A protein has these predicted regions:
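Short, glycine/acidic-enriched loop or turn micro-motifs at the edges of active sites
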Residues: 36, 118-120, 138, 150
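Helix-rich C-terminal or lid/interface subdomains of diverse kinases
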Residues: 150-211
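An alpha-helical support segment within catalytic cores of ATP-dependent transferases
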Residues: 20-23, 46, 58-116, 127, ...
Length: 211
């Protein structure tokens, strides 16, 4: 994945050395360049950060489509057709209906390179600008709406629904390739992450009640 990104304008780390079998380092090891910056603090300058996150995602999604032959295809983390409502839910019937909808045939939509875990904590910012995008472990070829949905879910539980709506609006303002199936993939993303989630494992600022 990082070799592919090195040929693109995406600000990702570059590979310095790799020992995937652990022959030298005893464990699988990857050494990369260090990117400048730190994860952004959204509440301070929310609009500016969200715009940069939206612009960067457009760059990711525009990576040469030859990538489809070099990376795995998108797949959900869990089998939504056999998933059950979260044990902590107070409205299991609502979750059952959501799972029914998410298990339907995915709607057609643009496919491209996706980060698969795109959210503020996997980006870096330096001197007021986005300086890097990290953690490409789950990178794959799939619906553009998956990355948007993943960002929106993280923004919703960390900062509220207004932040999630703002990101979608900004993304749509900087690209002509707009997924028409966003609500479906928002639902799939949420269920894929939350059905087996223990709320106690979330960072303190994450509040599922915001959903």
């Amino acid at each position: 994945m990082l070799e592919l990104l090195a040929e693109s304008p995406v600000p990702a780390p570059c590979i310095v050395a790799a020992d995937p079998a652990g022959a030298v380092c005893d464990v699988p090891t990857l050494l990369t360049t260090r990117l400048p910056g730190h994860p952004p603090g959204l509440p301070h300058d929310m609009d500016a950060v969200l715009m940069q996150l939206a612009e960067a995602l457009v760059v990711i999604h525009a990576v040469d489509d030859r990538a489809t032959k070099r990376i795995p295809g998108y797949r959900t983390y869990i089998d939504l057709t056999s998933a059950a409502p979260p044990r902590w839910s107070r409205r299991p019937q609502l979750w059952e209906r959501a799972l029914e909808l998410a298990s339907a045939q995915p709607p057609p939509g643009p496919r491209c390179l996706i980060h698969r875990d795109y959210h503020p904590e996997n980006t870096l910012r330096s001197r007021g600008r986005l300086s890097g995008i990290v953690d490409w472990t789950s990178g794959s070829w799939g619906p553009a709406a998956v990355d948007i949905g993943h960002m929106r879910w993280n923004l919703a539980v960390a900062y509220g629904l207004d932040a999630a709506a703002a990101f979608l609006r900004l993304y749509r303002s900087v690209t002509s390739v707009v997924p028409e199936d966003q609500h479906y993939w928002d639902l799939v993303t949420l269920l894929d992450l939350v059905c087996n989630l223990d709320p106690h494992d979330l960072p303190p600022r994450f509040d599922l009640a915001r959903l």
